């Protein structure tokens, strides 16, 4: 009887909408702005707890890295570049037990349904490369954004999904017209 009541209490379902059991008990966003000087939670996918975890791992003195590329490489979010005879062999990222990289990958994986430029970027990569590689590439992009925000005290400017899609469309049209011109053709816009 005692065991049954203990099990009932232990495995009782939480009420829906009760929030996360790991929710912070203080206003972390305002403390993050005070500590870092910028609002890191403005980046899609980055919550206050994620930003705290990343800041606690990397610190606020980013002068250890000369560039955002070195920072991303330290996190283990850059692909390897093995080359033999001019041919690229493999592109796996190095395995790392870095908690900041894990937090960035989790943040990137939450962007699949986000209606932001980063969400559209993630979905485009996911359809082309697959989920694991898309998560790593998007985490790399978020890491570079965070590095630039903290080091240069720049606020994140969300341009939105539509801006990203229009920019991608313009880039496709430019590339198609260049290829057509090289083949001796000309692209013309038609009205529908």
Where are the model-predicted features located?
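A detector of single, family-specific signature residues
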Residues: 1-192
